[in-house]
Amino acid sequence: MSLRVAVVGAGPAGIYASDLLIRNEDHDIHVDLFEQMPAPFGLIRYGVAPDHPRIKGIVKSLHTVLDKPKLRLLGNITVGRDVSIDELRELYDAVVISTGAVRDRELLIPGGERSIGAGEFVGFYDGNPRFERGWNLSAQQVAVIGVGNVALDISRVLAKTGDELLATEIPDNVYESLKTNQAHTVHMLSLIHISEPTRPY
């Protein structure tokens, strides 16, 4: 039995879902993979700090999936604007939604409206074409709220000079902007207590 499936979102989840579908042995499944950006890979392309080339190496394995003949990548298409979910349901036997986390959460504290979300800043330094390039980086002290991987990446990028970032995969236009970075102190604020792990004796 031959089936046509639409997968919305060409990040890692969408690509791996597509791979599982086209490798199905019970059905002959062909996948159209819709992506709103011009290029695939989602946060692997636009959410990893430029000084993490090993993580970006995952792109190579994702490329092998995209090269399979039963999969067609359709970029620059925003589902909900260019084509509706209802239209996809009419055209395909199934629709898989794998759009991921697309927005920063609002910081609901006094002065929160002056904050910049992690996704917005990461999109900037990774060269995502949908994000602003002309950042004001004149602050000498910066606070990063959070101590997770993304917060560490942002803090590390802000703590480096433009020249230190030049040896990474940073896009040229982002490098030019980050050369103006005046931050000399980056404070990381945690909402949880951080302590040494308890060791059993």
Task: Outline where the language-model segments fall.
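Beta1/beta-strand and adjacent pyrophosphate-binding region of the FAD-binding site
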Residues: 2-11, 139-145
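Glycine-rich dinucleotide-binding loop and its adjacent helix/turn
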Residues: 104-180
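Single conserved hydrophobic/aromatic residue that forms the stacking wall/gate
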Residues: 192-201
